[in-house]
């Protein structure tokens, strides 16, 4: 494989694995199934293609099934295989499954796997399971609940491809929120084999009165996990019996239980590399940009905080379960309102302040310090916030072109045309966009400065966005800014981000302390001691209060 290379159809572009990619690709080829959680932009598509071509050439498989999201299939895999003249077939109708030939890469979206499950299973039977599965963005299979759309897709994927002889899962981030999300992926990989036994001697549950963990004996010790939801519950009670929450994560960070047993399962198949390890380039610089609310923002935030306080008390007035659920939904909505105020107070009718908020002013001040011949991106999560930031940017920078991309304005190919055409025609352009609108699809190496103006619930979602600008071919330094108000509920969200990232690092074989990771992600711990807590008043009713966060050892 050292001499392997691909030349595009015009003969002008050649690609070849570097030493690290070659080493890891060889490791995964030595196993029938493997997980390749390389960082975004590190060349997973190239490595997967190489492995598919190798197994086809050596008679190990008749077909290579590439399963991924629709945007990944249409804007990454299909153009890549076409560019390098590799035989492939995109499945858009069930009749297309009759038109595949031995040696083909068969590209199919997750939705069509669910819709054409019976027909795919027939192809698998006819090929005597002699197929190779490449599951790109495997984190899309992170649930098993029958009522969940993700759960339905996951079950269909397991039914079609669980018994294949060769499987390769790939994802820049294997989980979004907690380690329990890795179970469906491991189940697909190992297919209930002896390599995935329930090795935890003790299981754990949470005492509802004390909030502490209670251990009990595992009745399936050294046995296979039960199918589907029952197996998921055993996995959950083995390693993380409770979810991370906006409040709980600050008061008690959830460490992974039975960590040694989980690390053993992971070590069988995962080959983890960061972008720097694969490329040899240290281009990524993450920083925190702390902003200060203007008086109008502070007034609006206090209104939301007091309203939230009132809703918390109402939550326990009735013992009726439906009422409790309704109140809980109101609380969640109130948290989102507080976070929305932090991001862009101008979208609220009760806001009576200037058009350029304190957060916007902090971003614009930083942009003024950046050389004017550099392109800049500002990422948010809501269409109306895109429009508000774009309007403010046009006012603050009248001599610079401002482009916008929302989740509804453009189809994926239209977004690519906007980026590679109009946006890159200007050296000083500013792009304001929905973070999700660029994930898994577009590479924009021309952008060196990215502002995360609206924090997500996990860093893996945000990294899917900012790694659009940090690519394998990149040579310039890249700067990522996390914008936040330290004295707000965003401090809780930052703790949540770091805790989830710590779990992801564990799955990648890295044991890092909370404090070290806090600094590595660019946040300043002394500026985030104050956070919103849920407590109880003298009458035992829940209330919110501000406190100084103490970091546990």
Give the location of each predicted region.
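Inter-lobe coupling linker of SF2 helicases/translocases
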Residues: 107-112, 126-127, 150-165, 195-347
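Conserved Helicase C-terminal RecA-like lobe
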Residues: 3, 9-10, 15, 29-30, ...
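Conserved helix/coil segment N-terminal to the catalytic DExD/H
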Residues: 97-104, 111-129
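Conserved helix-turn-beta segment of the N-terminal RecA-like "Helicase ATP-binding" lobe
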Residues: 71-94, 189-192, 396
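A conserved SF2-helicase RecA2
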Residues: 460-466, 470-552
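Conserved Walker A/P-loop ATP-binding site and its immediately adjacent core
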Residues: 45-47, 60-83, 179, 381-384
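Conserved helicase ATPase motor motifs in RecA-like P-loop NTPase domains
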Residues: 40-41, 164-179
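Conserved RecA-like P-loop NTPase helicase motor core
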Residues: 403-492, 500
């Amino acid at each position: 494989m050292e001499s392997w290379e691909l030349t595009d159809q015009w003969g002008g572009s050649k690609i070849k694995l570097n030493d690290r990619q070659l080493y890891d690709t060889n490791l995964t080829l030595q196993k029938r199934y493997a997980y390749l959680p390389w960082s975004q932009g590190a060349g997973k598509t190239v490595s997967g293609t190489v492995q598919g071509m190798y197994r086809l050439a050596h008679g190990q498989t008749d077909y290579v099934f590439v399963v991924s999201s629709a945007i990944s299939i249409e804007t990454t895999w299909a153009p890549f295989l076409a560019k390098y003249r590799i035989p492939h077939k995109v499945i858009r109708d069930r009749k297309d499954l009759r038109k595949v030939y031995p040696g083909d890469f068969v590209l199919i979206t997750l939705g069509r796997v669910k819709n054409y499950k019976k027909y795919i299973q027939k192809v698998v039977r006819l090929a005597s399971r002699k197929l190779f599965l490449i599951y790109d963005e495997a984190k899309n299979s992170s649930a098993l609940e029958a009522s969940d759309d993700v759960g339905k897709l996951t079950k269909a994927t397991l039914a079609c491809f669980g018994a294949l002889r060769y499987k390769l899962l790939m994802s820049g981030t294997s989980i979004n929120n907690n380690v329990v999300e890795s179970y469906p992926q491991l189940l697909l990989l190992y297919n209930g084999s002896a390599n995935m036994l329930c090795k935890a001697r003790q299981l754990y549950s949470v005492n509802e009165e004390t909030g502490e963990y209670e251990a009990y004996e595992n009745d399936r010790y050294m046995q296979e996990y039960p199918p589907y939801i029952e197996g998921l519950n055993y996995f959950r009670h083995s390693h993380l019996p409770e979810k991370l929450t906006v409040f709980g994560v600050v008061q008690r960070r959830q460490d992974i239980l039975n960590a040694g047993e989980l690390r053993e399962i992971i070590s069988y198949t995962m080959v983890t590399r960061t972008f720097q390890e694969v490329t040899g380039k240290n281009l990524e610089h993450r920083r925190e940009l702390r902003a200060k609310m203007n008086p109008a923002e502070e007034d609006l935030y206090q209104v939301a905080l007091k309203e939230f306080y009132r809703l918390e008390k109402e939550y326990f007035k009735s013992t009726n379960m439906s009422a409790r659920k309704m109140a809980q939904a109101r609380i969640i909505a109130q948290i989102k309102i507080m976070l929305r105020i932090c991001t862009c107070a101008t979208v609220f009718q009760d806001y009576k302040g200037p058009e350029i908020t304190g957060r916007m002013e902090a971003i614009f001040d930083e942009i003024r310090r950046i050389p004017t011949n550099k392109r800049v991106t500002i990422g948010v999560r809501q269409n109306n916030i895109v429009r508000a930031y774009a309007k403010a940017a046009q006012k603050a920078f009248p001599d610079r072109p401002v482009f916008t991309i929302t989740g509804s304005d453009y189809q994926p190919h239209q977004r690519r045309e906007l980026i590679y055409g109009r946006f890159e025609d200007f050296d000083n352009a500013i792009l304001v966009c929905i973070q999700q609108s660029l994930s898994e699809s577009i590479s924009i190496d021309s952008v060196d400065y990215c502002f995360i103006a609206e924090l997500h619930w996990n860093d893996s979602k945000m990294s899917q966005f900012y790694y659009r600008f940090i690519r394998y071919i990149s040579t310039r330094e890249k700067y990522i800014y996390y914008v936040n108000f330290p004295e707000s509920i965003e401090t809780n969200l930052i703790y949540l981000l770091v805790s989830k990232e710590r779990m992801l690092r564990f799955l990648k074989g890295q044991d890092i302390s909370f404090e070290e990771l806090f600094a590595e992600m660019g946040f300043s711990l002394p500026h985030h001691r104050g956070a919103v807590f849920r407590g109880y008043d003298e009458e035992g009713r829940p209330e919110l209060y501000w406190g100084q966060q103490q970091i546990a050892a």
